[in-house]
Every structure is written in structure tokens, then in C-alpha cells.
Regions:
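Bacterial N-terminal signal peptides that target proteins for export
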Residues: 1-9
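Catalytic domains of lipid- and phosphate-ester/thioester hydrolases
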Residues: 5, 20-484
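Processing junctions and N-termini across compartments
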Residues: 10-14, 470
Length: 484
């Protein structure tokens, strides 16, 4: 039986004509000069103690999508009493940040909502998508397109996603009532910056996000270096808008005032990047075209939490007292399969090298960015214990941040067999029926048994919880526990 990476390599070799540089057919369209993309609707709601759930889905192909689906399934199964009727936790998911395989489940959830989540299995995850890519790559029509036109390897993945799952859906279709803000992420090859598919970022490009197919963002998010070519977008700010783009006041303030770069360097860097994309004054680089590759979605979730200019405006809600319970769920589909390299005295062959190039950076970067998110959440939790607010500073008093990680290393000893099984699922777009069932079940189990998820259920008076209340409070403590 061919290995997972052997299948990647077969597809690579089959579409080798695409290895040369091509001028792509850009999938994004311009805005009318002076126009802006519609901002996200209000995410917070009227009840400050209702949980505000933010999720980051990591990469890992279909393994990551199935794990994320399991997490959403568990949220859908849990309800808590509220005024009038029980509320499902999945209805409190307000922001989903994603990358690679995680973007498949993020985009699907944003598009169809909780009721049709399970269709992701039959429409995509249960299918041998690697075989489809192989057949598409070997098709004479595809080969002709690859060699004679701007069609590239990433377009083959985009077409697969659109044909099998999204069926022409665009970002405008995500703006349904009650839908979460979905932030799919990639990396800008020119600058190395995170490129998030948000209304603000597409304002920077003078480009219409509503008209962009969802398959473009998912494919860009999943563009593994080497295995897939980048997804390319055109920056219309240089011609159609000529630098005249609304909504840039915060950028000007960050770049011209002397203190912002010392107070919040990351926010200053974000402003600098946005200014460059907008063809603004004294831009540090000119990017007429963007070429996007795989990235890590946790970084954008961090920005949503701390940036006063992020699309979700979570910090504003905290500052105004409109959000007192924030739930951060970082779903890490990092694999840990033994590839046999360390036990073999011979130098690894081409298959092993390509496997490492594709898989290892995804897994290691996921671990690093999750650690950064952990530091941020710890800081917010500490601030939540404060009862004093300086003038102009966020009101953190009484804020509870439930920090929940879903990671294959968190299985209990009695769940060892399931742990080994899911850790050995390769990074590809195909799962066996057993692998699909195991990955979804892993997501449900790992979320359900996390101490801070149990603490959330306890604080919401939801049932059932898996341990005595005192044990749960001890496992996921808050500073105000000492007071109450």
C-alpha cells in the first residue's frame, strides 16, 4: 500500500509542468474606489455572562478537519439553562480562526451552521480526496491546462473543494444571522506576515471579499510549501483605488504618533503591513500581487483577543463590560507518527524528505503558536483578578477566561489505544472510515474531559459534569474562587 506521502509525491510528479512560474488568473475582484467591505455584525450580544467562545483550528489535512468536527459536535451536545430556554454552546461560538485542514471545518461551519455539520463527513471527509487529486492530475485535460495556461497545483485543490463541498459558495454566504466570524489564515510570501481573509484585510487590497469563493481561502490556507503552489491574489489598491481607501485612520495614528510602537509593537507592525498593502505614504514595500501559503490560525485568534482594531472587537467588549466569560479553545491536530528515520542508519530517501518538509513544520509551528496563545490567556486571567482600572485602560475585573486546549497528548492512560491511532493518521486529504470515526471521537472526548471545559459547564449550571464541583474548581481555578 502506498504511504500518505507517496501519494503526495505521485500527485506532485504528475503535475510537474506547473513547477515553472506562471501568471495566475486572480480570483479576487476589485471594490469600487472609495467603497469598503461590510464589517462583521455584532458578535457579543446583550448578556455579559453568556460565554463568548473563540476557537482556533490547526492544520493537518483531513485529520485536523475531523478533529475540529468532533469539537463542534461536543459543543452542540452541551446545553446550559438560560432565560426562557436551554442554549447550546455551539450557538455561543463567535469567532473561528483556522488554517489548512482546520479551514475546511471552519468554512463549512460558518456556511451551514450547526444543523448541517455532519454533512461534512459524507461530502468530503469520508471520500478518498487524494485519489481524486491523483486522477485529476493525470487527466489529459488537466495536464494541458497546467502546461498551457495559468492553472496551477493549488487550483486543482481549489477545484476539488468547490466541486465536492462548497459548490460555488462565497464569503457573502457566511454573513447569515447568528453566524460566527470565520477568519481563515495564510502567509504572505513577500512579507512573511499573517494574511487573514477578513473585511479589513480586503479593504487594504481594495478587493471585494463578499465575491471571493470560499474555496480560494481554504486552498490558500492549505497551500503546503513544496507540495502545492501558492494561491495568488491581486492588490487593487495601486490602480483601482490609488491608495484612497476608507478606514485607515488607525493606521495613520499608529505610524505617525511617537508612542504606539513602544506601547504595542505588534499593533504597530500590523499597521505598517496594512499601510504597505494600501499603497500608503512611505510604504516599506510595494506588493502589487500577493502569493499565499500555509499558516497557523492561532496567531490571528491572538490578534482578535488583543487588538483594538481586530474585526471581532473583543477587547472593546471586555473594556465596556459586555463580555465577562471568554472561552478560548485551541484545537491542535499535531501528529506524532514514527517515520522510522531515527532508527535507520541510512540517509532518508526522497519520500521521507518530502514527508518531513510537509509535516514537521506544520506540527512544530502549531506547538509554538499554541504556547504563545497560552501566555496571552494566562495574562488575561491574571488581569481578570484585578479590581482596579486605570483611566482609559480595559476593565478586566471579573473577567473569566477559560483556556482549553484539545491536543492528542491529553488522552488519559486508559485511552492510550485511541491516542496511538489518531497520532498515526498522516497529513493528507484522505481518511479511512475508521480514522474518520476515531478523529471525530477524539475531538469530542478531549474537549469533554478538559478541566476548564468542565469548569465552564459547572459555572453555567450545565449537566452533567464529570467530577465533584470542588475537584473541578481545583483543576481549573480562578482568583475569585478565594473570595467566594
Amino acid at each position: 500500500m502506498r504511504t500518505v506521502i507517496g501519494r503526495w509525491l505521485l500527485a506532485l510528479l504528475a503535475i510537474a509542468p506547473a513547477a515553472c512560474e506562471t501568471v495566475p488568473d486572480y480570483p479576487n475582484r476589485p471594490l469600487t474606489a472609495g467603497a469598503a467591505n461590510p464589517p462583521p455584525s455584532d458578535l457579543i450580544g446583550a448578556d455579559p455572562v453568556a460565554p463568548l467562545i473563540l476557537i482556533a483550528f490547526s492544520g493537518g489535512g483531513s485529520r485536523a478537519a475531523a478533529l475540529g468536527l468532533g469539537v463542534l459536535d461536543e459543543l452542540a451536545a452541551q446545553t446550559y439553562p438560560a432565560t426562557g430556554k436551554p442554549v447550546s454552546l455551539i450557538d455561543r461560538v463567535k469567532v473561528v480562526s483556522s488554517v489548512s485542514g482546520g479551514s475546511v471545518v471552519a468554512a463549512w461551519f460558518g456556511l451551514v451552521g450547526p444543523a448541517r455539520l455532519d454533512e461534512l463527513k459524507s461530502d468530503f471527509l469520508a471520500r478518498d480526496n487524494m485519489a481524486t487529486l491523483e486522477w485529476d492530475a493525470a487527466d489529459p485535460v488537466t495536464l494541458a491546462r497546467l502546461s498551457l495556461s495559468s492553472y496551477t497545483r493549488i487550483d486543482a485543490l481549489r477545484d476539488l473543494l468547490d466541486r465536492e463541498l462548497f459548490h460555488g459558495a462565497r464569503f457573502a454566504d457566511l454573513r447569515r444571522p447568528g453566524a460566527p466570524l470565520v477568519v481563515m489564515n495564510a502567509t504572505d510570501m513577500e512579507s512573511g506576515e499573517v494574511f487573514a481573509f477578513t473585511p479589513q484585510r480586503f479593504d487594504d487590497l481594495c478587493s471585494d471579499l463578499d465575491q471571493l469563493p470560499l474555496s480560494v481561502a481554504v486552498a490558500a490556507s492549505a497551500a503546503f510549501p513544496v507540495a502545492l503552489s501558492p494561491m495568488s491574489l491581486r492588490n487593487y489598491s495601486y490602480e483601482e483605488c490609488k491608495g484612497a481607501i476608507p478606514g485607515g485612520g488607525w493606521i495613520s495614528a499608529e505610524l505617525t504618533l511617537p508612542l504606539p510602537r513602544y506601547i504595542n509593537l505588534e499593533e504597530y507592525k500590523r499597521a505598517r503591513y496594512a499601510n504597505a498593502l494600501r499603497n500608503g505614504k512611505d510604504a516599506y514595500r510595494n506588493e502589487h500581487y500577493l502569493h499565499l501559503l500555509d499558516n497557523q490560525g492561532v496567531q490571528s485568534l491572538t490578534e482578535v483577543l488583543v487588538s483594538p482594531h481586530s474585526p471581532g472587537r473583543i477587547l472593546d467588549a471586555v473594556n465596556s463590560g459586555r463580555a465577562r466569560r471568554i472561552v478560548v479553545i485551541a484545537v491542535n491536530a499535531r501528529a506524532d507518527a514514527d517515520n522510522g528515520v531515527g532508527g535507520n542508519p541510512a540517509a532518508p530517501g526522497l519520500l521521507k524528505v518530502v514527508n518531513t518538509v510537509i509535516g514537521a513544520p506544520i506540527d512544530s509551528t502549531t506547538a509554538r503558536t499554541n504556547a504563545s496563545l497560552q501566555d496571552l490567556v494566562d495574562t488575561l486571567k491574571s488581569a481578570g483578578a484585578s479590581t482596579v482600572r486605570a483611566p482609559g485602560q480595559p476593565l478586566f475585573a471579573g473577567l473569566r477566561v477559560y483556556n482549553i486546549s484539545v491536543d492528542f497528548d491529553q488522552f488519559l492512560p486508559e485511552q492510550h489505544q485511541l491516542q496511538i491511532a489518531v497520532k498515526n493518521i498522516g497529513t493528507s486529504w484522505s481518511l479511512s472510515p475508521t480514522q474518520l470515526q476515531e478523529a471525530v471521537e477524539a475531538g469530542r472526548i478531549l474537549l469533554r474531559q478538559h478541566p476548564c471545559f468542565q469548569r465552564l459547564l459547572l459555572d453555567l449550571n450545565a449537566r452533567p459534569v464529570l467530577a465533584e464541583p470542588a475537584t473541578i474548581r481545583k483543576s481549573c481555578p480562578f482568583e475569585d474562587d478565594k473570595i467566594s
